[in-house]
Amino acid sequence: MADSPREGKVARPPDFTQLIDLASEFVGGKILFATDDFFAPAENLLKRDNPSFKEHEYTEFGKWMDGWQTRRKRIPGHDWCVVQLGIQGVIRGFDVDTSYFTGDHAPRVSIQAANFEEDKQPEIPQREVRTGAAATPEEFEAISELKSDDWSCLVPMTELTPGNPASSHNYFPVTSQQRWSHIRLNIFPDGGIARLRVYGTGQKDWTAGDPKEPLDLVTVAYGGACVGFSNAHFGHPNNLIGVGTATSMADGWETARRLDRPPILENDENGILLVPGCEWAVFRLAHPGVITQIEIDTKYFKGNSPESCKVDGCILTTQEEEDMVRQKWDLPGHKWKPLLPVTKLKPDEMHVLDSLTPELQDVITHAKFTITPDGGVSRLRLKGFPSSICLLRPREKPMMRFSVKAGFRANL
């Protein structure tokens, strides 16, 4: 018997879904063009929130749907849209989500990609979010400047499964190591898709920009990634290095309360809590470099921020990182160089701190952020200058699983 819309076992998502969604509207992704938006506009594809369903909601054009839905095609051709990624980078995989499109999902899909430098991208007029309409001849003419018919194919024409919970996520891994800036989503011939997730890692052109301006070397927008952590009960450490400011506590890293905390808390002579444990997260920088300034934002964490924190750095080769992942980051203490000593934190506040004196600012490839005893932080920025040293090679090995509540994250 077929699963009902609310039944069925959902398969475990692939590892690449732990990476950032390069196309999300939250990081600046946007729709440049869509052939048709009759029932629901293509902009819904890029929403950060999961799709929703309103059983009795209708518009003047038909059933309200939280996704992109085109009219039933009665002319030659097929529907497609063009997405400008919010973060340019290497794509590791797609999730074409058909949630709630159970009788009108797009039956087939293909995905193409291209890379345009910012100064070489043709000017595409900003489109209006609308329903009940198709692309105008002027819009077709403008988008033709991108020559999207000739873009590289990352996903060939493939059948999609309908939007029941057990089948709504259509995952497509990508092996290309190339940097991409734009996506063309083709549906054959028409229909609906709830969300398009483009998972990958940011990749910055380090030759561009002002060399005298410090950069956030750990941000996901440039390719930074969490490669290990002790606990992520309420929020993944990758959130710490996300784009922009946090939008809520859910957009930060928060651990469970440690069970080894003493019944009665006491301070040492410096006012630091005497507690036996701590929580930590390790990050691979987007580029080896020297950290000069550290920003720690506890915004939204008002009754659950850490008491204190510290930041250490080290330099590792790819092989050494892989060894540390297997050893759950049991790295000898002498390998870590202090970037920020134990520092008291205040709740719901931005802390801007200088890294240790210049003579101690070694080039690092990895940073370890330690909080005591537990709690939540919304953002971590490690600002500095990229080094010409580059020990890391492109990653070829498959990613490894992790335990969300008390595990470690592996090679992203």
From Swiss-Prot:
Q: Name one GO biological process term.
A: allantoin catabolic process
Which Gene3D superfamilies does the entry mention?
Galactose-binding domain-like
One MF term in GO for this entry? Answer: allantoicase activity
Question: What Pfam families does the database record attribute to this sequence?
Answer: Allantoicase
- By its UniProt entry, which NCBIfam families does this protein fall under? allantoicase (TIGR02961)
The protein's matches in PANTHER family, at most eight in alphabetical order, are given as:
ALLANTOICASE (PTHR12045), INACTIVE ALLANTOICASE-RELATED (PTHR12045:SF3)
Give a short account of what the protein does.
The function of this enzyme is unclear as allantoicase activity is not known to exist in mammals.
What the record says about family reads: Belongs to the allantoicase family.
Q: What is this protein called?
A: Probable inactive allantoicase
Report the source organism. Answer: Bos taurus
Q: What is the lineage of its organism?
A: Eukaryota, Metazoa, Chordata, Craniata, Vertebrata
